[in-house]
Amino acid sequence: MMSWWSSGANTALDEQIEKATSSSLEDIALNLEISDVIRSKTVQPKEAMRSLKKRINHKNPNTQLSALNLTDTCVKNGGAHFLAEIASREFMENLVGLLKAVGPAAPNPDVRNKILDLIQSWAMAAEGRYELSYIGEVYKTLQREGYSFPPKPTVASSMIDSSAPPEWVDSDVCMRCRTAFTFTNRKHHCRNCGNCFDQQCSSKSLPLPHLGIMQAVRVDDGCYAKLTDKGGKSGGSDRKHHSSSRHHHHHHKHKSSSSMQPRDARVDDSFDEDLKRALAMSLEEVKSYSRGHSEPANSTQYKPDKQSTSVSKIAEEEDEDLKAAIAASLADMEEQKKRHAAALKEQTSNVGSSSSAAPFTLPKNDYELTPVEAENINLFATLVDRLQTQPPGTILREPQIQELYDSIGALRPKLARTYGETMSKHDTLLDLHAKLSTVVRYYDRMLEERLSKAYGQHSIGGYNLPAPRQPTGPYPTLDPSAPSAPGAAENFYTGEQQADYSHAPYGQYPPQPPQSQYMPYDRRSSMVGPPNPQYPQQQMPQRTGSWGNAPPAQAPQYNYSGNEVAPSQPGHAQQAQPGAPESAPGAPNNDPNASYYYNPGQPQQQQQQSAQQAPAAAPDHSYPTLPQQGHSYQPSVPQTPASVPVQPSQTPQQAHQRVPPPQQAPQQPYWQHSAAQQTPLPPVWQAPQQTTTYPGYDQEAFPSAPQHAPAPKQPVVEEALIEL
């Protein structure tokens, strides 16, 4: 028995089986390669069967179907040794177990039907063979159990017959030269016949494709001569003698004897038998259509010499007929082309006509190929390709090929006319395509013109201009929903709680443009004239009782960045000085609101008071006290010109009193301010509580106060109230 199996071959076979049984489409070429590997006995048939069984038990139904199809291909082409493993109890019981599985392990309906179909077809093909009888027993058992099989197909036993390498025969002497085998004269087996030979009689090597062996293997000299000699038929009796001593069945003996012949090695394969059957069926169909020649009664009576003479005669007659047929077909082709093109153009021109018109009927396709004729042409081309690898003279022994050649020769005029019709259709469709492309291009251009006109009309009225941007400034607008909220000047005098900048980092203040871009605030112009146009959203301060409900949105109205450099005090007084004389003549002296800012009846008292308290009260006159929780620095309103000359003497002390302490007492209410300003105050007052400055803030880090701000609250106001 052969011993050239290896684990590497089994591993390669497993990989090929996994690739062939994937969930993708079936690969017929790979299936045939696997069957050739099994037939050539490169791997053990039991290992191949177990690999297929493992893939059949897969959970994926697509993989199971592919594995079943591969198993069927291997059964038909794998040889008798593989059929014995398929008919074993191990494989068949596995299929029956899949059929009887219930619950989650129940097979897919398609897989179940495929298993039943394969068991039925294998049982019918193996009928009459003792070594494959277990398949028939399983089939009958399933029938008795009530399984519904598909309709019985007609399967011949030759469907599972395939040529496989023969079993090796053991002998003590060379079966050709009768030399005994010794330690130096080794024993070798011929892969073609399986007999034992020594080195001298088996030194040749040949591939054996009829046995599924594609690589060159060892053969004896007799088999080498028979396989390579194209016309030699000698040695047939010896071949029969050896095969009869080796096989027990007449069928296997016949196969072994015929496999020695160069032509019979391929013709007697099951595939060639199927091909012969297909040829016969196609010829019968040709006869039914009465377009072919009649098949001879006995095709085996054709001799090579008669066949060659008939081929030459037919070729000569066909040349003259072919010339006449080609000339007639060309004339008909031109006429048919013109007629068909005119009919198509007429149909396209009458598209817009009424539906009651007679429908267009295509010309009769008298010269169109029938499916049977097209199949015969393809079959003839396939046979011609296969004859390239056959020994010479094979074409003479195949009368079916000659019959196909005769029937296809009569189809040449049809092919020519069909080609003409196709070309005319192609030209007409090209013309229609060109017209359609032109119409589409004109339509696109018209749409573009309409769109451009529509957009041009809209642009005339200026609708496509961008919307004007609202002027943005460094100060946010006041909330219009709170008209009674106090303004910036009122916050200054009412003493409302403001943000304390001592709790915020230095670099978090938003940068603002320089103060020189804005007009200085004039208290009299804000009271008499219209508001400054630089602040259109700011309302005039209203002295109402709702001063304590100022919204926090007003807090960042006058934010001053720490990066700004405050202008000097004299320069600020000079900026505010020109606006004061202009508004002084028109200032109403009898206005109670204006009396809050300056009292005409007490100018001398204020001047005298400021002259007496200039050394100590300079920080309070020039800057209001800032509470701890304020949100922004509020710019103070300008002061009357009467207090302007006092400012130069106050400048040196302002550098030390720039930032008031956060521990300062809260400011007094609004009405206390007005009472304190309208009544004379005693010159005695308390000194400032604390003059410490915060580290990291210098004089330039805070904005300078206007020079003529009204006098804020005095620390001794309570004494004045007590006197009142």
Swiss-Prot record:
CDD domains in UniProt: FYVE_spVPS27p_like, GAT_Vps27, VHS_Vps27
Official protein name in the record: Vacuolar protein sorting-associated protein 27
Domain notes: The FYVE domain is involved in the binding to phosphatidylinositol 3-phosphate (PtdIns(3)P) which is required for the association to endosomal membranes. Both IUM domains are necessary for efficient binding to ubiquitin.
Protein source organism: Neurospora crassa (strain ATCC 24698 / 74-OR23-1A / CBS 708.71 / DSM 1257 / FGSC 987)
Residue stretches of biased makeup (Basic residues): 239-256
Matching InterPro entries: ENTH_VHS (IPR008942), HGS/VPS27 (IPR017073), UIM_dom (IPR003903), VHS_dom (IPR002014), Vps27_GAT-like (IPR049425), Znf_FYVE (IPR000306), Znf_FYVE-rel (IPR017455), Znf_FYVE_PHD (IPR011011)
Molecular function terms, GO-annotated: phosphatidylinositol-3-phosphate binding; ubiquitin binding; zinc ion binding
Sequence similarity: Belongs to the VPS27 family.
Zinc finger feature spans (FYVE-type): 168-228
Biased composition (Polar residues): 296-312, 625-640, 670-679
UniProt entry tagged with the keyword Repeat: yes
GO biological process, one term: protein targeting to vacuole
Keyword tags: Endosome, Membrane, Metal-binding, Repeat, Zinc, Zinc-finger
Domain UIM: 270-289, 317-336
Topology within the bilayer: Peripheral membrane protein
Coiled-coil parts of chain: none
Annotated Pfam families: FYVE (PF01363), UIM (PF02809), VHS (PF00790), Vps27_GAT-like (PF21356)
Region called Disordered, residue ranges: 228-268, 286-312, 462-714
Cellular compartment(s): Endosome membrane
Chain ranges of the VHS domain: 18-150
